[in-house]
Amino acid sequence: MENDKMEIYESLIRWLSELNLSAPHGTVQELSDGAALAQALNQIAPEVFTDSWLSKIKSDVGANWRLKVSNLRKIIEGIYVYYQDELSLNLSEELRPDALKIAEKGDPHELGRLLQLILGCAVNCLEKQKYITQIMELEESLQRNIMAALQDIEYIWQGASPSRNSINTAATSLDVKTLQEDRDTLAQKCHETNKKMLGLIEEKAALQQEIVKLQAIVGRYENPNLIGDDGTSLGPIQLGSSRYNDLRKLVDSLKDELLQAETARDDLKMKSMIQEKEIGELQVKIDELHAATAEIAQLKDEIDILKEANEKLKICETQLQTYKKKLEDYNDLKKQIKLQEERSADYLKQNLEYEEEAKKYAGLKGQVELYKKKIQDLHGMLDEEMGKTVRAEFEYNQLQGQLAVVQREKETLLSERDTLREALDELKCGQAVGADGVGHGGPGGNTMSKELHSNDVCERIERLERENKALREGQGGQTALSQLLDDANQRNEKLREQLKSANQKILLLSQHHAEDGTTKSELEMQMKQTLELGEQRSSAQQQLDETTQHQLSNLHTKIANLEAALVVKDQELQAADVRYKKCVEKAKEVIKTLDAHAISEALLMDKVDSASGTGVDATLTTVGNGGTAARAPMGQQEEQLIATAFYRLGMVCHREAVDARLLSGPGQSFLARQRQPAARKPLNANYAKK
């Protein structure tokens, strides 16, 4: 069995060589790349296996089995598509050749199955007669193997189920099934007749061979020089001889066999004629079946056309219904247009009335603008005066602090002056007592309480006492006492002059403190000089300079920071004023657009603003106390206006929502609701735009 299959596959390879292919195709390995098979398919059915399809098959693959597998899979897939589309046959996947085995191992069994499929394509293509004649011109052994391969393919076809498009009606499906069964039975009969014809051809060839053999035997016996089996010459044939009798018997037997062969031949001729008639009848039936299949295809096309017409009819019906709905909506729109025309006429009348009112109020616009400008100027003046008052208050507070410091220093100086006077009086008293009892002088003469003197006075008194003692011890007498008294008097006069100058400077500083700030430091230094009486001026001056420089640097930094903060605050105030003015203008516009009655409210508001503007001069006199109160009434008025505008806007939105709910009621269709006009805006908006 395997040998027969191998012979069939070799015969198919030899048949493939008759197609004049350019690619090598002599062995299984040469065919395993798929290039020759693709060229054969392109030559057999160029309308399906086109040149573009052939270009996808790679020819130079070498030993790359992956490219071979890719080529073979493309070929097998194309063959299956050809059988399905062109021949209306669905081949099972079990019969699919294994491309991997062909490419990797060169399996002849799988390659033979692929060649069988290619042979089926050649026998059933448009030029099938050409390929059938090529097969008939081959050798008898090749013809037998190719016929056997065709029989296997026919068995495969009989097992395959044809792929047909589904037919809706039951009658047409039954006709198609019966026609397919008739076609299968006729194909089976044709196959059987072909097998019988092949058998008769083989018998004819065998008979011809036997006739040749018999003719050779007759020629040998007719030879007179024929030698028998025993080596003796049989001699010429004569009547009555044994040789003649043997030959006569042989001739009679051969005649009988010839008659039998002729009768068998006549029987076979009769059978062949009958089979030819049957073949003709079957061919006629096949033609009728082809015509019936064509009619069925036409019927299917008509059914498809009717389906499309039915779908179009449904679409037209739906469109007709939509058009009816649109017509109803159009009628509704006509009614709505009439209502809108009536409303527009009313609106025109109202617009005329509003225009007349606008002409009346046009004269008041100039006054309103003037009042606005005046109000803005007054606001600017008010801001400037407020800034001045703030600065004046700041300077006033600073001056009060400085004045309090100076007063405290003055009080301390006055108290020190009083103490010095008391000390001077006590010294005078002590000197008078010393003059009365000089011999009794000593520490007991100093009966004054030291608690009544300051530290400096005590030190001076002690120093003066020591000097008095020294003078009394050194010189003695009234002369030393008189000199000391004169010195003390001179010092007292100097101290009094210094006190007078210090008091005068304090008064001058209190009067001109705002103009000259540097005199304070000088006064403090002089006061310290008078109080300390020559204490270490250099060290005190250095320390004072360091502290003043440090304080000045701190003050400069604080001033710079305050100036920067002041600039930022000014910018913020300007931006707030701009936003404030914008909000006021927007509130006025909203009130004007909301209702016609807002015009009178705006006029009242302007009157209130003007009245408040006239009162600004009165409030400017009391800037320090009521600077912020001038702006408070206007802010309250504007807040009230913004609140009224907000409530009116809420009423309008509520009205629009109610109109939308009424328009989208259940009594109207969807399209009618979509075509409803939007809720009208208030008429005063149009007036405001004009």
From Swiss-Prot:
SUPFAM superfamilies: Hook domain, Troponin coil-coiled subunits. Belongs to the hook family. This is Protein hook. One of its GO terms (cellular component) is microtubule. The gene is hook. InterPro entries: CH_dom (IPR001715), CH_dom_sf (IPR036872), Hook_C (IPR008636), HOOK_N (IPR043936), Troponin_sf (IPR038077). Disulfide bonds: none annotated. Keywords: Coiled coil, Cytoplasm, Cytoskeleton, Endocytosis, Endosome, Microtubule.
